[in-house]
Amino acid sequence: NQEKANWFELLKTAPKAFWTVTLVQFFCWFAFQYMWTYSAGAIAENVWQTTDASSVGYQEAGNWYGVLAAVQSIAAVICSFILAKVPNKYHKAGYFGCLALGALGFFSVFFISNQYALVLSYTLIGIAWAGIITYPLTIVTNALSGKHMGTYLGLFNGSICMPQIVASLLSFILFPMLGSHQATMFLVAGAVLLLGAFSVCLIKETHGE
């Protein structure tokens, strides 16, 4: 009980940046949960025109998603090196830009029916991923003093798992509501990630609160 009380006390006194970055993270991880869940099905629908998971086309779509996931990872690695060179005063602009480009990538998946054009979509998504793995911890750790750093970072991990749980639960409502089309879920993901991009504007970077 004492440990729980200490956690609540730490949360009450957490720097504002902790909460605003957590809000951005919520939207980001929510959106990416839908990408991981619906990519193969969306590609099968749009490119191979099939929803039959046992069909050859669906298997080819799954294989192509494996290629696109590699493209996304490579784009994220390259972009991460670039972001590491960006001065601190441009953190928010870089964070916003990465997420906005990722939202564009999500939206484009809904419209694209050419498998090779999807390379651009997943490159943009990779840029968003670079922002997600680069900026949040940097901004939060800058805002914290050394005291309770480990505990705060442990609590911050909740901003990763909770949105994925919420997204998964909401999909039971959203998916049938949107006609049970997996590609349509990318419009939801894009809209949510765009909310994350604009939420970056709420972040006020501080140092050692």
Ranges and model annotations:
Residues 101-113:
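C-terminal ends and interior cores of transmembrane alpha-helices
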Residues 1-23:
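Juxtamembrane intracellular "pre-TM" segments in multi-pass secondary transporters
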Residues 166, 187-209:
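Multi-pass alpha-helical transporter architecture, strongest
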Residues 131-145:
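Intracellular juxtamembrane helix-capping segments at the cytosolic ends
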Residues 173-193:
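A membrane-interface helix-boundary motif in multi-pass transporters
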Residues 78-91, 175:
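Helix-to-loop junctions at the C-terminal end of transmembrane segments
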Residues 146-178:
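A late C-terminal transmembrane helix in Major Facilitator Superfamily
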